[in-house]
Amino acid sequence: MSKKPKVGMWSGLTAVTAVLTAGAIVGTTVAYHYTTTVNNYLDADTYKIIKGDSDEDTEYFKSDFTSDEERESYEAELCAQVEAEGAALLKNDNNALPLASGAKVSLFGHGSVDLMYGGTGSGSVDTSKAPNFKQALEDQGIQVNSTLWDLYSSDDMMKNYSRITPAAISDTLEANTQYAVNEAPWSKLSSAESSFADYGDAAIVVFSRSGGEGADLPSGENGTNDSWIKGQEGDGNYLALSAEEKELLQNLKTLKDNGTFKKIIVLINSSNAIEMDFLNPEICGEDYGIDSAMWIGDVGQTGINGVAQLLAGEATPSGSLVDSYLYDNMANPAMYNFYTQAYPNAADYNLLTDGPDVQGMYSVYQEGIYLDYRYYETRYEDAVMGTGNAGDYNWSTTVAFPFGYGDSYTTFEYSDFNVTESADAFNVTLKVTNTGSTYSGKETVQLYFQSPYTDYDKANGIEKASAELCGFAKTDILAPGASETVNITVDKSELRTYDANNAKTYIVDAGDYYFTAATDAHNAVNNILAAKGYTVENTDGRMTADGNVALTYKWTNAALDSTTYATSETGTAITNLFDEADPNKSSSEPGEVTWLSRSNWVATFPTQPVVLNATQTLADHLAFTRYDGSKADSVEMPTLGADNGLALVSMIGADYDDPQWDTLLDQLTFNEMVNTITLGFHNTAAIESIGKTRTKDENGPQGLTAALTGGASAMCYTSEDVMAATFNVDLINDVGRCIGEDCLAMGYSGLYGPGINMHRTAYSGRNFEYYASDPFVAGTICAAEVNGIQSKGVYVYLKHVALNDSESSRRGVNTWLNEQAAREIYLEVADKAVTDGGAWSVMSGFNRWGAYWCGAYDNLLTGFLRGELGMRGMIITDYSGSSKYMDLADGLIAGSDIWDSPDPTIHTTLAPKYENDAYIVTEMRESMHKILYTVANSNAMNGWSSADRLKVITPWWKTALYALDTVLAVLTVLCIWRLVVAIKRKKTWTAEQAANTVNAQNQQ
C-alpha cells in the first residue's frame, strides 16, 4: 500500500455529517412539533381534492373585481378616502388650512419621515408599498423642503433619533421600557436651517406615538416611571410632549415671529390620545403659535394621501373624535386602576407567575360606566346644576376637545329638528345646510339621549350618564348653500339600562328622556341643559355655552318598565350573568369596591388603586384545571368513525339544527376532532372522513395581514379609530367588503378581527386595533365592517370578548367590574356586531372575568354570546400555545371550540386522557358542529361540488425533511464506514512502513 489512508479527512467528514444529521433530526422534530405553524408559513397543501363528475356552479362567493390590479387600485383610493373622512380638524385659526395651491412647506418631527401606519404585534401591517408624506404632498402640488426631508431621513438621524417601540410581543408591564419618543434636538436641524425661508409657507409638525400588542404605554404614574422614556427629559408620560418636542415648537414659534414661517400646523399621528395642553397657552403657560391642528390617527397604507388631500383643500375635514382629548390624561378616572397589580397576599396562596401566565395579578374597573365622555360630561352637568357633590370640577380645564368634536373648512347649520315616535323606535329628521361660501363638505350629525337619574337608581346602585350617543348620520358632500335632510332611527332598546341589584335585568326608568342633535357630546349636554332651563347667565358661568333648545326633544315614560327588555330576541331570559366578576358579589370574596357614582362624585372618585386580597376560594377558582372527570359517564359516548358517506359540502346552507349534522358528525374520529380543536393556530384542519378542506385564518384589524405567520398580506387600512371617526356606515361597510375581497383573492376564509375592545384609557397598547371609547359608534361601525367582510364568505372572529382593554400582565389577569358596566359598555360592541352585523365567530381572550378565564366562563360564552345573542359560529381562544390556564376540558365545557395553538402538547398529552370520557367527547362533538357549520357557509367551500372528495396528504416539506434526514444519515453511515476502513488501512500502512524501514536498515 503506497498511499497513506486519509483518516483525518474521513474523521472530519464523519464529524460534519454527524453534526448535520443531528441538527437535521432536531430541526425535523421541532418542525414536526409545530406542523401547523410550518404549514401556515409555507402555505403547504395538506390534502388533495379528488374531483367528481359535476356541472354545479361551485363559486359560492364571487369577486366584484375583474383583476387583482383593479382591486388593489380601488382599495388604495378607498383607504385614502377613509382617512380623509376620519381625520378630525381640531384647530384652524385664521383659516390656516387648507394650504394655498403650490405652497412651499417644511416638514418637522421624526414622525414626518416615519409615520405611524399602524401598531405593532399581531395587527401590524406591511407598509413597504406605502407612499411617504413628501410624496403625498407633492402629488397634491405642494412643494416640500427636500433639504430638511433628507436630513430627517439620513442614516444618522434614523439611527439615533427614531422612536423606540416594543419590537416583539411581550406580556409584562416592564415591556414598556421599550417606549421612547426620541425626537431629535433642535440643534440637529442646524444644517437645514438656511432652507427654511424658501419653504416658509408653513411649518408642518408631525407628532407620532406608537402602541403595540403586549405592552401598554407608560403614563409616569402608578409605578410607570420616567426611566421608560429612554434618554429623554420628561415625567415619564409617553403621551405628553417630550422636552425635545417642546423645544421644536418653541423654535418654530421664534421663526414664525421673525417671518421665516407664515403658519405652524400640527398633525397628531397617533391612536393613543396625546395630552393637548400644548394647544392652549392658558393651560400649558406658553404660546407655541400653533395655527392649526389635526388628528389623523394611524394612516394605513395609503391614508397619508387622504391627509395630503385635506391639507391641500382637495377634501374638507369631516371626521369626529371617538375619544375625548384631555389636557391631562390623569383626569380620566380609569387611570388609577389601569395598570395591573398583584394581590398583596398572593404568595400565601401560591398564586403563580408561570412564564407569561399569571394568577395573582388583577385590575379593577372602578369607574363603572363612566368611561370617557360619560364621566366628563356627566360630572359637568352635575357641576352646572349643583347636584351630585361635583366639587370644584371644571370641564374647561379638563377637556381640550370633547368626544365627537371635529371642525371643518366650512360651516353648517342645523334646523327643522323633528322626532316622531313609533311602537319600537324614535324617528328623527334634521335639516343640515352648508352656510359657508367657499368650501363643499360633509357633516356628521350626532344624536344623543339622556336618561333620567332617579331616586330608584340611587337606591339600587344604577348609574346614568348625562349623554349617550344613540344615532348618527353623515351627509353627502354639500356645496355652499346646499341642504340635506338626514334621517336617524333610534330603537327604543337604546334607552334601556341594566339594573344589576334589584330587577336584575334591563329596565327603562320612569321619567323624562331628552334627545338632541349635536356636533359633539359637550354640545349635546349644553342643549339638554338649555331644555331644562339652564343658561350661562343663570348658572354664574358654570355652563360653558348656551345650548340650543330647538335641537332637543323630550319624551316621558310614565312608569318603570322591567319587562320589555327582560328577554332577548332569541327568547332567552336576561338576568345577572356576571356576579362572579363583581368583587362585591363574587363567591371569591376578594374585597369591597366603591364604584364611581354621580350620587357623590367627590367621595367616590378614585385617588389610588383599589386593593383586593386573595382568598382560598379565589385560589380554588384560579386553578389551571377545574374539571375533575366526575361527569365522564353522565352521558352516552357519541358515535365515532361511522361510514355514512356524507361530505361537508352537502351541508352548505343547512340550518344549524338540521338532523343531517348528526349524520355528518357521526363520521368524525376522536383524533380528527382533537386535531381540529387543539391545533387551531391560523387554520382549521383538513378532515378526510367528511371531505373538509383546511382553511386559512389570519389577522386583520386593519386589513388582512400575515405579519406574524409569514403569508401574504393585503391592503392595510387606517387604524380602527379612524374608521369609527368617519361616522360613515356605508364607507366602512365597503372597507369590510374589500377586506373580504382580499381574503377571497388570497385564499383566506377566516379573519382574526375586527378588534372590539374599548379605549378605556389613552395608554392601552392596542387602541389602534379598537374603534372608540363609546360602544355605540364602535358597535355600529363594527357591524357595518363585519357585514362587508362576511359578504365574501369570510367568517370574522371578533376579538377579544371581552375586557382585553390593556396589555400589561394580560395572560390571566383577573379583571373585576360590575354587571352594569359589563353590559352597557364592554359587551355592547359584540352585541351589535353579532345581532346587527351577523358576526359568525369570536375570539375570547387572555384575561379572566374575576377568577374565571374568559375562554372557560360559561356565563359569558354560553349564557351571553350563544344564549342572549344567538351566536352560532365558533369561539376560538386567543393564542394559547402551552398556557396551562387555557384548559381544554374547562374551555370545552364553557363553550370554547378551538384553541389558537400551534403547539401539539394539548393534542399529544392532554386530550388523550379524555378519549374515554363521554362527557368531554360530547363537548368536542358539539364544538366540531360549530366549527363545521361556520366553515360550510364560508368561501372555503368555493370550488367544491357534492361529487368531490378529499384525501389527506403529507405536506411536501415533511417529505423533504425526511429525505434530507435520510440522505444525511446515509452519508454519515458511509463516512463512518470509510473512517473505519481508513483506520484499519492506516494500521496496515503503518505496519508496512515500519517493516519497510527495518528492511532498509538491514540492507545498509
Predicted regions span which residues?
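Glycoside hydrolase catalytic-domain context in secreted enzymes
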Residues: 1-498, 507-515, 521, 569-1004
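Terminal connector regions
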Residues: 492-565
